Amino acid sequence: MANYTAADVKKLRELTGSGMLDCKKALEESAGDFDKAVEILRVKGAKDVGKRAERNATEGLVAVSGNTMVEVNSETDFVAKNSDFKEFAAKVADAAAAAKANSQEELAAVDVDGQTADAALQEFSAKIGEKLELRRAVTLEGDKTAVYLHQRSADLPPAVGVLVAFTGEGEAAEAAARQAAMQIAALKASYLTREDVPAEIIEKERSIAEQITREEGKPEQAIPKIVEGRLNGFYKENVLLEQSSVADSKKTVKALLDEAGVTVTSFARFEVGQA
């Protein structure tokens, strides 16, 4: 006969966050000693963390608080859409915003309920039984930010997040900045202006364009102009201000922002599980 009750199992589950079967086993092993059962589950959780460390966490969500955006990963989308996980990620985002975290290392060190985010993560990981990761954080400078969070389906949390820092006044400016954020989410701009593209990237693209042009057998005198045209194509694809707007394909993003009196000063794009 069991030396514990269903109420004991329920209480143990609520206290530790462990599964029903694990709680029953712990109570059986402890001969009904509740405190001993809690200790057994804590030890089991610590052991499981080591096993989970070998697994991959490629699901999760993107959360934003103020000028700060974070990515927190889980192993499965089942956990990603769990309300406790979303609440935990929101706490991490708030703490990261307060600390102006701007890297994974800074994110791991922020204070969440009196302990580091990394310690809180390990504790929460033991509770839910999945590997979790504090993937990255970014904080943009500026008084105004536009946010766009994209869900892949209605039952899942945001998997793509974009944060845009900008200057501009009024509703039209805010709408234009948000449209820019949606543009970045969809077309994945890597740079704000062509001046932001590293020299080594430009040289690599120029070299590839020249090689392709020569292999096509173009006249030697025409090669420089063709190469520059292809390089401009690279800019139009990867530089935000030079992209054609998804809202009005006849205009560039820069043209629409100028019309609204908006200057984008920086942006960041996170996609769950991506670099």
UniProtKB/Swiss-Prot annotation:
The primary site where this protein sits is cytoplasm
Q: Which Gene3D superfamilies match?
A: 1.10.286.20, DNA helicase RuvA subunit, C-terminal domain (1.10.8.10), Elongation factor Ts, dimerisation domain (3.30.479.20)
Assigned keywords, A-Z: Cytoplasm, Elongation factor, Protein biosynthesis
Q: Name one Pfam family in it.
A: EF_TS
UniProt xrefs under InterPro entries: EF-Ts_dimer_sf, Transl_elong_EFTs/EF1B, Transl_elong_EFTs/EF1B_dimer, Transl_elong_Ts_CS, UBA-like_sf
Q: Which GO terms describe its molecular function?
A: translation elongation factor activity
Localization of this protein: Cytoplasm
- State any GO CC term: cytoplasm
Residue numbers spanned by region Involved in Mg(2+) ion dislocation from EF-Tu: 76-79
Query: What does this chain do?
Result: Associates with the EF-Tu.GDP complex and induces the exchange of GDP to GTP. It remains bound to the aminoacyl-tRNA.EF-Tu.GTP complex up to the GTP hydrolysis stage on the ribosome.
Similarity comment: Belongs to the EF-Ts family.
Protein name per its UniProtKB record: Elongation factor Ts
Q: Quick one: which gene encodes this?
A: tsf
